[in-house]
């Protein structure tokens, strides 16, 4: 209960800041770029703005070789931070190998919604420890890199679904915003919709690989995305993306792109409020 109250207090602070803040990073002319890597039915996202670069989720252990080659192909030798949205293997699986790589990493981040009695087993804690480093837990209202990233969820910890403990982030820049959802399902969606913290965003990273237990019509109506990115593999997960999810996104006018459509991944760029999409090849 104390942890829930702390998260709600942080969220109230976020709402207050949002209502009276000065112009944010979304109103600058800096480009904001998201690369959603093709790592099968898993998540690995590279968010960049200027010299700042965050890797959000690390794919699976088995997909690390592909992710490593993709990062090398893009010239990534330094990360401002590694953020793991929640504790599913298709999101943290490559963390250990990343820690053992030559890529410089300034910080490690994870969701506050984690059982403290299992702290030593936290995969990101173990990965950071390889480098003798500690992790930072992110709570609603927290920001990184002068507002480039703002944490809006999770508001509460849910024992019945680790997916609904996913960090939900708003990335601001390039004259717009991107909503990055991890594996957020309906319960966490409803929490954030009820709290009124989901902004309209040009880009939506679709939750839970486009499966039918996420991405409600209400969420899509709130976000109003121009581009929706789905990280999935229909070979591994035939029911993804779900027809309903594709239908609700299409009805909202969103361009739908999937990581399985590209060799390396999909690059989405926000600049001057305009969105461009590129399918990256080896």
Can you say where each PLM-predicted feature lies in the sequence?
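Bacterial N-terminal signal peptides
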Residues: 8-16
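Positively charged n-region of N-terminal signal peptides that target proteins for export
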Residues: 1-4, 8
């Amino acid at each position: 209960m104390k942890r829930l109250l702390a998260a709600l207090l942080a969220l109230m602070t976020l709402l207050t800041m949002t209502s009276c803040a000065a112009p944010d990073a979304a109103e600058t002319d800096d480009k904001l770029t998201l690369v959603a890597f093709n790592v099968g039915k898993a998540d690995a996202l590279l968010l960049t703005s200027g010299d700042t670069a965050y890797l959000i989720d690390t794919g699976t252990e088995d997909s690390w070789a592909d992710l490593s080659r993709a990062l090398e192909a893009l010239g990534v030798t330094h990360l401002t931070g590694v953020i793991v949205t929640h504790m599913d293997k298709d999101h943290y699986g490559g963390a250990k190998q990343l820690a053992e790589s030559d890529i410089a990493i300034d910080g490690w981040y994870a969701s506050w919604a984690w059982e403290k009695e299992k702290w030593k087993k936290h995969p990101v804690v173990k990965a950071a420890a390889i480098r003798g480093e500690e992790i930072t837990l992110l709570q609603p209202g927290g920001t990184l890199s002068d507002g480039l990233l703002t944490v809006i969820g999770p508001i509460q910890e849910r024992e019945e679904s680790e997916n609904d403990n996913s960090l939900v982030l708003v990335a601001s820049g390039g004259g717009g915003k991107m909503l990055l959802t991890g594996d957020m399902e309906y319960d966490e969606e409803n929490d954030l919709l009820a709290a009124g913290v989901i902004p309209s965003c040009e880009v939506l990273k679709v939750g839970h690989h486009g499966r039918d237990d996420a991405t409600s019509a209400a969420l899509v109506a709130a976000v109003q995305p121009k581009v929706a990115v789905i990280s999935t593999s229909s070979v591994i997960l035939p029911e993804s993306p779900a027809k309903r999810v594709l239908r609700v996104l299409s009805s909202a006018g969103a361009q739908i792109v999937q990581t399985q459509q590209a060799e390396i991944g999909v690059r989405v760029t926000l600049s001057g409020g305009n969105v461009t999409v590129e399918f990256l090849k080896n």
